Amino acid sequence: MPFGLKLRRTRRYNVLSKNCFVTRIRLLDSNVIECTLSVESTGQECLEAVAQRLELRETHYFGLWFLSKSQQARWVELEKPLKKHLDKFANEPLLFFGVMFYVPNVSRLQQEATRYQYYLQVKKDVLEGRLRCSLEQVIRLAGLAVQADFGDYNQFDSQEFLREYVLFPMDLAMEEAALEELTQKVAQEHKAHSGILPAEAELMYINEVERLDGFGQEIFPVKDSHGNSVHLGIFFMGIFVRNRVGRQAVIYRWNDIGSVTHSKAAILLELIDKEETALFHTDDIENAKYISRLFTTRHKFYKQNKICTEQSNSPPPIRRQPTWSRSSLPRQQPYILPPMHVQCSEHYSETHTSQDSIFPGNEEALYCRSHNSLDLNYLNGTVTNGSVCSVHSVNSLSCSQSFIQASPVSSNLSIPGSDIMRADYIPSHRHSTIIVPSYRPTPDYETVMRQMKRGLMHADSQSRSLRNLNIINTHAYNQPEELVYSQPEMRERHPYTVPYAHQGCYGHKLVSPSDQMNPQNCAMPIKPGASSISHTVSTPELANMQLQGAQHYSTAHMLKNYLFRPPPPYPRPRPATSTPDLASHRHKYVSGSSPDLVTRKVQLSVKTFQEDSSPVVHQSLQEVSEPLTATKHHGGGGGTVNKRHSLEVMNSMVRGMEAMTLKSLNIPMARRNTLREQGPSEETGGHEVHGLPQYHHKKTFSDATMLIHSSESEEEEETLEAAPQVPVLREKVEYSAQLQAALARIPNRPPPEYPGPRKSVSNGALRQDQGTPLPAMARCRVLRHGPSKALSVSRAEQLAVNGASLGPSISEPDLTSVKERVKKEPVKERPVSEMFSLEDSIIEREMMIRNLEKQKMTGPQAQKRPLMLAALNGLSVARVSGREDGHHDATRVPIDERLRALKKKLEDGMVFTEYEQIPNKKANGVFSTATLPENAERSRIREVVPYEENRVELIPTKENNTGYINASHIKVVVGGSEWHYIATQGPLPHTCHDFWQMVWEQGVNVIAMVTAEEEGGRTKSHRYWPKLGSKHSSATYGKFKVTTKFRTDSGCYATTGLKVKHLLSGQERTVWHLQYTDWPHHGCPEDVQGFLSYLEEIQSVRRHTNSVLEGIRTRHPPIVVHCSAGVGRTGVVILSELMIYCLEHNEKVEVPTMLRFLREQRMFMIQTIAQYKFVYQVLVQFLQNSRLI
């Protein structure tokens, strides 16, 4: 041969060497094994060989992966020949064994060996830095790992071996001294876990890792259909998409995905419910093929094994059931009740103890969670908004139930109690969108009484979670000294030294779950004879009774003893402190949308009953229904009124009463006491009549008249007693069992509207149809001394008179359903119940009477109309006489003087001069964090940034290592009351997760948005909450999932209920979103009264949320106010509310001084002279409304 090559001539063919190959597999404990396979062997065969060596039976959770030629981790296709696959794609024939399919709960893993390998995998994920965790979590995990790997600390003479053991993630670069300090902390953590078995420590380690961000996720860089670079990820719940800065934009659940395919370099996600396809682009075709194949494999696995694929309109919380005992842990753990005696229909086999868990859950496991409620609940069963935690995991499901019942708390804010109590009710997230907020509807007595008539369930088969459903055990009654006031405020004025005192320090302390669930905060015994909270609900109010031996029962105590204990009686009477139901159905806007919001927490506790709570309902309805028979009018002789009068007779009496009252306007009206009488009333003479006070508020305890207790008499008679100068309405009656049965059929319907222009009513004023303000209440002076008993108007008479025009605010679909139900009901069932819903013909007749009397009134008679309206609405004012009154009269500035001063400034142009003299920002302001280059894109307008000393600081994250958000703390003290706001810009598309992080960390419950999403064709604020009616009505922003529960449009503003869930901890919170939508693109709103109604809605919701949080937090959380840049309209809202507070409480009104003070906390507050002038217009309108009171 010319080249000197030698050919072998043995002619032997090595068959064995051609048909077999050896591959190496690195295990999770870093050991490497070799496996001899044939060239035709698949990856599945190799995996089974590895599992045989590890004694694994549950191999379907694991897989094999390799490093590609581009050093990317790639999973082996188990069904294809392994050698061919590795030769084509792998960098070297080295495989890695690992967990391919993560699970949301380690309890799914049945085998001990499986759990051990799973533990090795999650520990490897932590140590390699694939999961983000804080130093505290690193120490805790390291301590558990040492306990799992080495056992108890006392087996070693010292902890020196820890220096050679890998304890911390690879990316945790630290100095030697800091590393030594961390090692010592790990040694202490290891010592604290002494006595825990290694297997238990492994499970505890896994449980801790499951809460970390990024657990079980694989992420691939792709581009969306718009060409934006995003991360396409996959985990056990589905497929998610987030942008490069980390904000999670959307999650596609496994049940929503039809298929995953690829077309060249594009990946297509075909959705089932929507006729659309999500499209993503990769770098090359092979990448797209691999990702689509991987996603298809995961999709098939999780759907076949029914993991995170339950039917739900929103991603459910991950519920974990620990399979080990935590009794040896040194840290306090949330109290978890074991699943005992759970009986459920075969539709669902999972029991949720979450208060919002009314949707079917997983079909294969029984999970229990104690703190996944919409509102915070205590360990002893008391919840902060006046309810008792419904612990469904213990005896709370009967065999007849086919769905998970909700707690009496309005956790699902959009589902009324009447629907939940129906046996055929199927929860639907999508159909709950038209329901009004939880603080507006009233208890459905018809349903409650109907169930009560069917009889009580046996004690052993009842749900014990609601047996201690008593008003005394709610949070409202845990603090009986608190008063809830309506607008205008009537509370005592606090002494003050400085008009606007600035809070210098801004401490940001996060509320830990242990703080939120501290049972000591709610274990407040109720003393006999303590003051009660006043009831103010839309239907006849829940009357109080004398407190007799009240005892504080907790849910945990009741569950422990399995005893039925009836609730204690209601506390002793107290005057109402809110004006109930002055809001008619809205057409354009309602000024003061919900006056009865402030005490709605009391109503919520009797709103959504289970069958075993009927004794409470029975006791309440006995008191509620008494005034229904107490209708009288002045001018007729004493007669007997049968309690089973028809509707027409009672309505004629009502109209007669009103007509006689109108005719007697020339007679001065005496005082009406607002306190209910404890015993038989005795009429004495000497009603001294006093004139009306000046146009300013007297600080009294009540603006509404409460119910009157009936006597114990068996007589069904009503005696008419007339005072010389006053139309008297009195009653001394008891009703029979027949009437109670009739009351049980009362349909709790809101009254229909007038067929003409709708009236809009505020807490402070009623407006005529023409738009001119009408007085809503008049104040009569009441004597403290004197033996005479007071006169009172019952609530039934108020409802009869006001029923046509003054009803609860409901949504239009609800009104339609009410009308349909009216048509279906037979005429013979109309007595008494129709008091709550007058028919159209009666409404027309009453309108005619009102119009005729209105035309007759002239001169001095017209001036007395405010007093008449107050009387017809059952309103009176008890002004306490004495030295205190003299002091207030001497110091109070009449409303007319303040009104003239404000108008004079507007007319003389002094407002412009004031505004020009106020500096735009603080002279020596520091903006060090805001001006950092990495934070420049986080501000909408780079010239508008927060001061360093009072900026809102977020907990730093990997994406936001400075914790920056363009938001400022605004703290003002006026008259001894501290006001705390957070003024911020509207979130940008890439800062929505920062916004929700701020809301969560600052404990915010109310968000006031003073802009539309788009104005004049320009985007004013990115939408940072999900639209109602969209798929799932929920969206995920970083670590937070936001779900829209309801939306109520009130003309110039919209009220939205949101549920915010922290994905890592599973905790949830209710957030009210109030959006003002009538601000024009240029200028200011023309409808000043509408803007006032928006401010009143903010006040109402604030009072509601603060009352819910009483006892949990020492200070009320701030309100987030934002517009586009967070300075112009935001400043208008804050300044207007503060100045209105000054007017209400007779504080000195200095608008320019307050604005200067606000600008020292956030620059450019109120950007234009038009906005500054608008604040004055709001104050003028407020005073004009107040003049009529």
Swiss-Prot record:
SUPFAM superfamilies assigned: (Phosphotyrosine protein) phosphatases II, PH domain-like, Second domain of FERM, Ubiquitin-like
Any one biological process term the GO annotation gives: lymphangiogenesis
Residues the record lists as binding substrate: 1123-1129, 1167
Keyword annotations: Cytoplasm, Cytoskeleton, Hydrolase, Nucleus, Phosphoprotein, Protein phosphatase, Transcription, Transcription regulation, Ubl conjugation
Residues of the active site: 1123
Region described as Disordered: 744-775
Main localization category: cytoplasm
Short name of one Pfam family: Y_phosphatase
Domain of life: Eukaryota
Protein name: Tyrosine-protein phosphatase non-receptor type 14
Organism field: Mus musculus
